[in-house]
Curated annotation (Swiss-Prot):
<dbReference type="InterPro" id="IPR052608">
    <property type="entry name" value="U-box_domain_protein"/>
</dbReference>
<feature type="repeat" description="ARM 3">
    <location>
        <begin position="217"/>
        <end position="258"/>
    </location>
</feature>
<feature type="repeat" description="ARM 2">
    <location>
        <begin position="175"/>
        <end position="214"/>
    </location>
</feature>
<keyword id="KW-0677">Repeat</keyword>
<dbReference type="InterPro" id="IPR011989">
    <property type="entry name" value="ARM-like"/>
</dbReference>
<dbReference type="GO" id="GO:0016567">
    <property type="term" value="P:protein ubiquitination"/>
</dbReference>
<keyword id="KW-0539">Nucleus</keyword>
<feature type="repeat" description="ARM 7">
    <location>
        <begin position="396"/>
        <end position="435"/>
    </location>
</feature>
<protein>
    <recommendedName>
        <fullName>U-box domain-containing protein 24</fullName>
        <ecNumber>2.3.2.27</ecNumber>
    </recommendedName>
</protein>
<keyword id="KW-0808">Transferase</keyword>
<dbReference type="InterPro" id="IPR016024">
    <property type="entry name" value="ARM-type_fold"/>
</dbReference>
<comment type="pathway">
    <text>Protein modification; protein ubiquitination.</text>
</comment>
<dbReference type="Pfam" id="PF04564">
    <property type="entry name" value="U-box"/>
</dbReference>
<keyword id="KW-0833">Ubl conjugation pathway</keyword>
<feature type="repeat" description="ARM 6">
    <location>
        <begin position="341"/>
        <end position="385"/>
    </location>
</feature>
<comment type="function">
    <text>E3 ubiquitin-protein ligase that functions as a negative regulator of brassinosteroid (BR) signaling. Targets BZR1, a positive regulator of BR signaling pathway, and promotes its degradation via the ubiquitin-26S proteasome pathway.</text>
</comment>
<feature type="repeat" description="ARM 1">
    <location>
        <begin position="133"/>
        <end position="172"/>
    </location>
</feature>
Amino acid sequence: MAGEGVEMSEEEGAFEAFVCPLTKQVMRDPVTIETGQTFEREAILKWFRECRDNGRRPTCPLTQRELRDTEVSPSVALRSVIHEWRARNEEKDLDRACASLVGGFAGHAGDEEEEESALRALVHVSQICQRSAASKDLVRRRGVLRAVAEMLKSGSRRLRLKSLQVLRVLVEDNDDNKEELGKGDTIRTIIKFLSNEHVQERELAVSLLHELSGHEPTCERIGAVYGAILLLVGMGSSKSESAVAVDKAESTLRNLDRFDANVKQMADNGRLQPLLTRLLRGEPDTRVAMADYLGELALANDDKAAVAEQAGPLLVGMLRTGATPAKEATLKALREISSSEASAKLLLQRAGVLPPLVNDVLFSTGHLPMKLKELAATILANLVASGADFRSIPLDDDEDDDGGGGGRGRRRTLLSEDVVHSQLHLISNTGPAIGCRLLSVLAGLTSSRATVADVVAAVKSSGATISLIQFIEAAHRDIRVESLKLLRNLAPYMGAELADALGGSLSSLLRAISSDGGGVTEEQAAAVGLLGDLPEGDSSLTRQLFDLGAFRALAPKLAELRRGTIRGGNRYVTPLTEGVVKVMYRVTCALEEDAEYVEFAREAGLAPLFVELLHTNGMDTVQLYSAMALEKLSLQSSHLTAIPAPPSPPAGFGCACLGRRPAAAAVPAGVCRVHGGFCSLRETFCLAQADGGKAVERLVACLDHLDGRVVEAALAALSTLVCDGVDAREGVVVLGEADGLRPVVDIMVESRTEALQRRAVWAVERILRVEEIAGEVAADQTVASALVEAYRNGDPRTRQTAERALRHLDRIPNFSAAFQSKRS
């Protein structure tokens, strides 16, 4: 029989009785009418409808005889004969196609005749199997299914495409064929098509996989192929694939998620919902398994938040009521979920994770494995790192009564004294893993101004300072780092206690700072940060550090950091630099106490180094402490300068005003005009000397800094050039030469902070002592207004200074000398 335009060469001829007179085709459902003639049912019914539509009585198409009725009778015998005839022909067609596919084609591209023959055979197989479901079993038994599967490896795209189409027909509604196709590497071959560049191959492959995934054993094999689920997930979420391909991929994934192993793979590849569905709706054992696997995943932050929102309450419930295995699986999941800020806050605020975590696990008096406490400590550290307000999160379900007859007691929180005491106790009496995480918890709580005071009070009341300091020398690096971070956070609030207790641990700190592991480490940054935050006025600690060689070791390290020769390539370079600058600033605070410190500052070249550090853009703390150190150093210049014989009086005097620079007074060669002796930046710390590396210019540049603290420190350093004990008039000249007068005046006018206003008013008053400047400034109403404002609203000292400045501007009249002397 000719099937859909495909010729069959050896077809058994059809009898005339098999052919419908109307369609001229072999009948499938023959029926007989009143005249005894036989037609295809659909064809004769159509003829009757046309007769009625044309207003004619129904007639026989062959005899044209009018019919009394249009009843038709099935011709059962004829239909049976036709069916047998058709089956014989289809079997012959199938035999020829099978023979062609199984033994006649090697699957290689290049022979067009063989390729065309194979394509015709594939078409015959497809058509026959679509007409007869029984043929699908015959195809399998004769090896055609396997032969078609092998054609998927053909070099001909046409053959590959047709093979994918035919395979889908062969396995549709036939589990035996699906089982057969699932054997060997055919599934792997089909999956490879999902990454093919050709769109049609991808669509046909995913359609075939969708059909195969309806068979449970084959579905399991699909999931077992490496990369299959990833490719399907990618196709299912693709914006470039066709809607059909996306839908088939999604449907295939839904079939695949019947197996736990596939669900885990999907979660690995970002498709979390099947796992969450099992977790939320599964049996208890399934929930535990899903929670356990959830803890093994490396989730993106968005996924962590989604899991926390959907499954957080359930996990907290499992933590409260579950047995030990369930608690462990839940804690693993919570450890992963809590490691982002958004998800941690969801767990705290919506799921209520804190009370069971702390009360039922971490501080539990039951016989829980230490592994669970370690997990709980890690989760707690993650939660604290989220920055949530732990003052408002109670650890108890209900507030306790205070025992006074109805009053309600203060809620227990993570910051309650007894809770902090319990943490400190665990830190000292458990292994390094738990201790490290709890140190991290306390370090996180003390990093917030809102909560640090509670922890400081608890540390003091527990007497745990010595214990915490001992962890600096722990064998485990992580414990050392976390303890250093905690102690550094405590230093601003209990610096004296820490300085007294450090004692022998100072050498350990210095070893940590000086260690060279090929880059800057977190431990180095934390150790030097702690030293830098201890009170700089503690002379005993300064002496200890000096005797231990701390300053001599850190000075060259600071120089290397400035030059960039220490390249950590990480986030710890900046905190290390800031910490070292703070430590080196300490020695400048003690220059008046011991000549050794002065000699060291000279040898180490601290003044030139701090001048260089003023140019460290982006490091406000470094610039701040460098300017502060230069102030301390500059104050020593008048004591260190070597005074020569008195120079000849200058021929005349001029001063740099707001817009021009006067000529400086003549001084002997090599003599500092500000300090009146032989000065240098390195030896006498003089900012005004030519070897100062533009110290004054760099300090002036800092007056425009956005950080008011840096501005104040730079102004304080510059003020040493116009203070008592130096030639202030010459200091004004130096400031003028560096274009520093206008910025000082602008600071006073802007009045950003009270401290800045006080310093600026003092400096302006000193500048206005130079008559030439006072004369010019008198015309600037903004300066006078700023001084009047300081005079009206400043503190007593600032008001006195502003009054003197206004007198320089003749804004306040000069009274009698006697009265003036009393006023001064």
